[in-house]
Swiss-Prot record:
GO cellular component, one term: extracellular region
InterPro entries: PAAR_motif (IPR008727)
Official protein name in the record: (p)ppApp synthetase toxin Tas1
Description of the deletion phenotype: Deletion mutant in PA14 strain displays an approximately 40-fold decrease in competitive index against PAO1 strain.
Record has Ribonucleoprotein as a keyword: no
Keyword Secreted among record annotations: yes
Entry function: Type VI secretion exported toxin that pyrophosphorylates adenosine nucleotides to produce (p)ppApp. Thereby, depletes cellular ADP and ATP to dysregulate central metabolism in competitor cells.
Predominant place of localization: secreted
Catalytic reactions of this protein: AMP + ATP = adenosine 3'-diphosphate,5'-phosphate + AMP + H(+); ADP + ATP = adenosine 3'-diphosphate,5'-diphosphate + AMP; 2 ATP = adenosine 3'-diphosphate,5'-triphosphate + AMP
Keywords from the named record: Secreted
Secretion signal span: none
Source taxonomy: Bacteria, Pseudomonadati, Pseudomonadota, Gammaproteobacteria, Pseudomonadales
Amino acid sequence: MVAGAVAGALIGAAVVAATAATGGLAAVILAGSIAAGGLSMFQIVKGLTTIFELPEPTTGVLIRGSFNVYVNSRNAMRAGDDVSATCSGLPLNHPLWPFPVLIAEGSATVYINGKPAARLQSKMVCGAHIKTGSQNTFIGGPTERVAFVLDLEEWLHTGLEALGLAALAGGLLLAAMAGVAALVGVVAIGGLMMGGMALLGDLGDRLGPGYRDLFQGVAGMALLGFGPKMARLGNAPKGAPKTQVPKGFEKVYGKAPAAKAEIDAVADGLAAKHGGRVAKAPIKSRERAMQKINNDYKGDPTKIKDLARNTIIVEGDKVNTVAAELANRGAKVKVIDGNADPLGYSGVNSTMNTKAGIPGEIQVNSPEMIYAKESEDMARILLGNDTYDAVAAKAGVPGGQGHKYYEDWRVLDPKSPEAQAIAEKSRAYYDAVRKGNGN
């Protein structure tokens, strides 16, 4: 039965391995499934053996025996004295024993030559037991063990029972931590399962010996299917998943308001000097900032550059002038050339270190680029209706298409025909918008 129990335990472990449970829930389900699988296979093997009267394998032959006491003309066997020549260990219930194996158990009330009388089912030190003997002589009394027994089968059975009880206790604890409703639910489900097992046992007893074990064992294996379902319930998402907070994030994010005030003051001064305006974006949200840090900067919050950001909007012929002044102030300026950009977009991105200790981002765009890349509602807010309508009249194409082209293009292979077709349309679109003196 050891091999069957191990197989059942492995089945239980495999069932849980296919789930996504983690932490305490996974430990409870894994322990419970291993115990259920092993104990169920114990019962299945025992039930089938009893029902079909399957013969047990012979693993050894008893030798010696009492020199002066006989049972049906055969030497009576004594615990602590007589042996089996060897033990083959089959069917993996106990280890191979290539030397004499002592009888370890006998009757506590019947002695032969001062030794407990061995009888059917008395165990050997290897864990095997005596399976044949006299059919008409019975030796009574409780069992006395006179030597250590390497009883792997009994140890495994006891261990699986203990594991099952531990899983039950852990499950009740987790349910209690989850709330009264969860605890009541677990107790109710457990009660139904135990009641069902009892009914199956009663039905099996009516059919004959062995059926109780068979029915309960098969039901136990079937119940293993509840393991993955419980894991999925325990791991069911409760709203949107929380983004992991990068180490040092709070310190960096706390500097964003001061950085924003500083770059907004710089942008206001340059816009006033060159007849433009400033689009002041709010500080990037905490959730979006953490996502970007985790995805783009491997969790390093010191590398994010646009917690504080704004855009200076000036006429196209002044974009490069403003960019040069930002560079003179120490900003790292990147000029995006429409002829080199794959989608034809043009503009200026700059990163400026602030006294707050984190960088801020200042973009420089012409009204035409704002018209092209922003939605109409946003572009009208940034430019004002008069400027928006004037750009629209010069461009002769609808606004806001640049961002749409970008979103369609970025999910494709840049070398694919579809991506190249979108890029060509985007370049033509930006060229059309730039007719109105956009950068």
